[in-house]
Amino acid sequence: NNSSAAVESVDATVVEKKQGIYTHMQSEAHVPWFRVVFEMTDGSLMEFQIQQGDFRELEKGDRGMLTYQGNRYICYQKYKFKSEAQEEEKC
């Protein structure tokens, strides 16, 4: 349950972006989906479904602070300089 999970913020790099169209079975509506894979500093990968606006802002190779709760994406604050982690405002 995401609501009982702790909110965590970790240093992470965008390693993959995925998008596609989901067709709703009953209404046959076509709904776009957007997912991003992040690599943590320990090498582990986490994948989250995100909103289209956030998806457009992220580029493969971006480094920043990923905030999430369980398997729910909250936000990603890109570092101004890709070469080093630094304190940024929380998103």
Model-assigned labels for residue ranges:
Residues 9-11, 45-47, 63-65:
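Well-ordered beta-strand positions in beta-sheet-rich domains
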Residues 39-41, 51, 69:
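A short, compositionally biased micro-patch
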Residues 25-46:
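OB-fold (S1/OB) nucleic-acid-binding surfaces
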